[in-house]
Amino acid sequence: MRTSLLFYRTSKNANKEASVLSYELLQKAGYLFKTSKGIYSYTPLFQRVILKMTEIIREELNAIGGQEVCLPLLQPAELWEKTGRWKAFLSEKLLYVLKDRENKAMCLAPTHEEVVSEFVAQWLTGREQLPIHLYQIGTKFRDEIRPRFGLMRAKEFLMEDSYTFSDSPEQMEEQYAKLRLAYQRIFDRLNLKYVIVAADGGKIGKGKSEEFHVLCSLGEDTICVSGSYGANVEAAQAIPPSYVYDSNLLPVEEVATPNIRTIEDLEVFFNTPKHKILKTLVVKTRQKDSEKFFAICIRGDRQINLTKVASFLQVDDCELASEEEILKHLHVEKGFIGPLYCPIPCYADETTRPMTNFICANNQKDVHCKHVNWGRDIPLPAFGDFLLAEAGDLCPQNGGAPYEIFQGVEVAHIFNLGTRYTESFSVGFQDKNGDKQLCWMGTYGIGVGRTLAACIEQLADNKGLVWPLAVAPFSITILYNGGDTEGEATALQLYQSLNTEGFEPLLDDRNERLGFKLKDSDLLGIPYKLIIGKSFQSTGLLEIESRSGEKCNVSPENLLDWCSKNLPCHTRKIPPLREQN
């Protein structure tokens, strides 16, 4: 490709909304055009990157027996109602919903578990067809409340999603292991630093689940890592620091605490450390059409983990109750909620069990109690793990070694779903006794755009993008000084030679200074620059510079040999482009 024929535009300044590096550079380098908030057009440059990324995905999934399909973007509500997810997704207001001319409710696909389950249920004829692995690479939709960070959180995005159907839990685990390894190979080919962490399945499913996170400072997710074990902070099991509490139980006392609402205020008012204060939070849960409220007690120095609370209570969703809801159901203002005389069911974190003579609210405004004790002043509640893991907490999966905390961007998620969806759609087969057996299902997904954005966040430098060679739009840029007729002739000859051999060069044939072209090549993130500069006239040697700054010299006669050792060769050669008039 010649730069003069490439439809692109670079810019010195990015959109004012470009709050992250990846979004800023994709716009400045001419890869991305903002059509609307959270909706983007991919330019020819970015489409080349996308095609290479998706080709890597196809190669790895085909290698383990995956079969590519194309599932509909428009889905009927009745399929989602079979699994109970229609109302669950509607409650989050993230689903694009519409009605057809027959007034039937439809949605734009955020995922495809229901559609693929219906498909396989109709076509599966026998156990001998199992396991089945179907995958697609296509568009998904999510009506984000606050679309931001460019491709990190968009309303319309590109995903690879895989679905496996197996005849047993053991076969399901085998498929899970195959997909997990295939995903590792995909990210390894991009030379990314990433971790695989235990995760919560959320609304997709409650079975075994892991996330792939690319490590970078921007990361929206907090990752807990200890040795070879890692977990999303929402799923991480942790052993917090323990404390020794009083053995001599003191009489409970009510204390006036006018407008003392926060743990920090109580710490100062009572001159006592936070771990001796009991914090009570009210959560609202949803299970199908039912909403309930619960009180959750945790130590004052810790934060609540709503994902763990939802799992403990076995509900679909869980969130902190609003001030209005607290006032309505407990008849007390936020900041004065406690387990004493609590009118709603109350549970406590395991770390509160040894607490004695603690301070807590008693559901009266401007009043707290001190010297409160479990069993004596408050009936012993059911205890569970309700805490977010923190740096320094001990990891039970790694022999009690401490956690380190990192930020990561989730780029892939894999799940074992069991029979949750296959039961709803009767996806199964007859066993040797003639009895119907349900299939065991897995679902897996890679965010293509998120992966590329995370790649930029991790690898880019102050000069611009730094694409891995595997997905760069072009492998090498051929550069010469504008107006240098001899350099132009040499560049054209080299371009035609590399192009014919499938090395995907970009010939910068603009009438611009060499320095300008060099900066543009760095901004675009092209892995190598082939420079026909002043030294070529005296030495006859070409200069090759990598994006990382490493340099070498090569003669025109040995250029193809160098390329064959350092650049990918695409077997489908790019046909010669038309010459300019």
UniProtKB/Swiss-Prot annotation:
Q: Where in the cell is it found?
A: Cytoplasm
Kindly report the protein's main subcellular placement as a broad class. cytoplasm
Against Pfam families, the record matches this protein to: HGTP_anticodon, tRNA-synt_2b, tRNA_edit
Q: Name one GO molecular function term.
A: aminoacyl-tRNA deacylase activity
Provide the top EC class. ligase
- Catalysed reaction, written as an equation: tRNA(Pro) + L-proline + ATP = L-prolyl-tRNA(Pro) + AMP + diphosphate
Record's Gene3D superfamilies? Anticodon-binding domain, Bira Bifunctional Protein, Domain 2, YbaK/aminoacyl-tRNA synthetase-associated domain
Q: Which SUPFAM superfamilies match?
A: Class II aaRS ABD-related, Class II aaRS and biotin synthetases, YbaK/ProRS associated domain
One GO term describing the cellular component: cytosol
Q: Which GO terms describe its biological process?
A: prolyl-tRNA aminoacylation
Q: Where is the signal peptide?
A: none
**EC number(s) reported in the record:** 6.1.1.15
Q: Give the keywords, sorted.
A: Aminoacyl-tRNA synthetase, ATP-binding, Cytoplasm, Ligase, Nucleotide-binding, Protein biosynthesis
Query: What is this protein's function?
Result: Catalyzes the attachment of proline to tRNA(Pro) in a two-step reaction: proline is first activated by ATP to form Pro-AMP and then transferred to the acceptor end of tRNA(Pro). As ProRS can inadvertently accommodate and process non-cognate amino acids such as alanine and cysteine, to avoid such errors it has two additional distinct editing activities against alanine. One activity is designated as 'pretransfer' editing and involves the tRNA(Pro)-independent hydrolysis of activated Ala-AMP.
Entry domain remark: Consists of three domains: the N-terminal catalytic domain, the editing domain and the C-terminal anticodon-binding domain.
Q: Which PANTHER family match?
A: MITOCHONDRIAL RIBOSOME PROTEIN L39/PROLYL-TRNA LIGASE FAMILY MEMBER (PTHR42753), PROLINE--TRNA LIGASE (PTHR42753:SF2)
Subunit structure, interactors included: Homodimer.
Q: Which family does it belong to?
A: Belongs to the class-II aminoacyl-tRNA synthetase family. ProS type 1 subfamily.
- How is this protein named in the record? Proline--tRNA ligase
**Which taxonomic lineage is given here?**
Bacteria, Pseudomonadati, Chlamydiota, Chlamydiia, Chlamydiales
| Gene coding for it | proS
